[in-house]
Amino acid sequence: MKKLQNVFAAIKTGLLAKATSVTVIGSKRVFEILSRFENEGLIRGFQIIDISKNKVSIYLKYKQDMTSLLSKIKVVSVNKEKLYIKGKLLKKLNTGVNMYFVESKFGLQTLPQLKIRNKRLYAPLGGEIKYIVEINKVNPKIQELIKKKHEI
């Protein structure tokens, strides 16, 4: 968990400094989160630069006015305080400007992925909300593209 918090802190610091990339120590969970960020278009990508030390370079992404799509990255559930959500309540969460990472028996998934999986199940599954990524307010065209990407 601390590695992931360090990664989030490095990303935030890099975005504030308008850096093109940041280097962090990776783990399986870090790679999983970074691949989701890359798929969602929140970062340009990432690359392992030293396998023996597990160092990863994260390439940050900016809009034309040099502002980031990422507004905040919050670690919600920690060891002592966990936040769970029932499957029936997943439909009520608005994914328009926030990206939720939920840990369920299917592993770590974004909220739209879990909603799609729940459509196939008799009883919808919930899970533990691990991370919330707040996306900056963007122009409506980009926001529509993000919504369409989640629907596909």
Curated annotation (Swiss-Prot):
Q: What is its main location?
A: mitochondrion
Q: Which SUPFAM superfamilies match?
A: Ribosomal protein S8
**GO BP term, pick one:** translation
Localization, per the record, is: Mitochondrion
Q: Which UniProt keywords apply?
A: Mitochondrion, Ribonucleoprotein, Ribosomal protein
GO CC aspect terms: mitochondrion; ribonucleoprotein complex; ribosome
Task: Kindly give the Pfam families that the UniProt entry links to this protein.
Answer: Ribosomal_S8 (PF00410)
Please give the Gene Ontology molecular function terms for this protein: structural constituent of ribosome
Q: Where are the transmembrane segments?
A: none
The Swiss-Prot or TrEMBL record describes its family as follows:
Belongs to the universal ribosomal protein uS8 family.
* Listed name of the protein: Small ribosomal subunit protein uS8m
